[in-house]
């Protein structure tokens, strides 16, 4: 179910952003120099990763924790054709907050950190 959920998030992001992002993909799982270099070269981009799950408020249910790494080549995109980090993050929250797959509860925004 984790893979299906991740793929649904990626598909939703790709559909919403169209060709504005160079890459929308799964985070490769490590922070090696090669991974960082690739992520920076392919900006702007969004990478999705599942961080794990904990016990939910309802018995027998889990609460999954997801992270969306947003990579940009500028903070504030002033040109319409080049979104900055601020614009990407705002739009990402708008398109994913409350989004649900067939088998999951809605995704809710918790926090953004820099």
Task: Please describe what each predicted stretch is.
Residues 1-114:
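Charged, amphipathic alpha-helical segments and their flanking helix caps
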